[in-house]
Each structure stands twice: as C-alpha cells, then as structure tokens.
Amino acid sequence: MKALDYEGRRNISGERVRQKRTERKITQVELAARVQCEGVTLEQDAISRIESGQRMVQDYELRALSEVLGASMDWLAGKE
C-alpha cells in the first residue's frame, strides 16, 4: 500500500505544529512529554517526523497536539 501524501508531505499540519511549538519555546522532547500527559504516546522522533512531513498524523494525535499547543485543530490543519 502506498503512503498517501499531499504535495510531497505525509501530513498538512507539521509546519504549523513546528510554528506553534517554537512560538511557545517548547522542545520536541517537552512536547512529546506533554502529549503523553494527554494520553497519546508520541516520542521525540515522531514529533520530528511529523514536523518534517515524513509521518502521517492520526486524528487523536492532532487533538492532543491541539490541546498542548493551544491551537485549534482547524488551525493546525491550515484551515484558519
């Protein structure tokens, strides 16, 4: 099965995740730990791959990232 992509990326939210994370001065390790407190297991390397567009993002992961980063899911998905 071929991995889906959008303009060469496996997600549309990675750049926004990185933008919000750096605005909040949170490291990838800190973001991973905070997301885990939301009940979703994401390691630092997964955060890195999400931000670089190399990894798909599940809906429940996007919801946890949204909560931790203080951004709406729509904003992370580029709709706002």
Regions found by a protein language model. Name each.
Residues K20, R34, I50, K79:
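Residues in the recognition helix of alpha-helical DNA-binding motifs
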Residues R16, T27, E43, Q58-E61, ...:
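Residues that mark the N-terminal boundary/hinge immediately upstream of a DNA-recognition element
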Residues L31, E61-S66, L76-A77:
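Hydrophobic micro-packing sites on short alpha-helices
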Residues D45, S52-E67:
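Short, basic-rich loop-to-helix N-cap that marks the start of a DNA-contacting helix
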Residues L4-D5, S48-I50:
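Short, contiguous strand/loop micro-motifs
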Residues G8, C37-E38, G53:
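Short helix-capping/hinge SLiMs at alpha-helix to coil transitions
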Residues K25-R49, A64:
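Short alpha-helical DNA-recognition segment
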Residues M1-R24, D74:
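A short, Lys/Arg-rich alpha-helix, primarily the initiator
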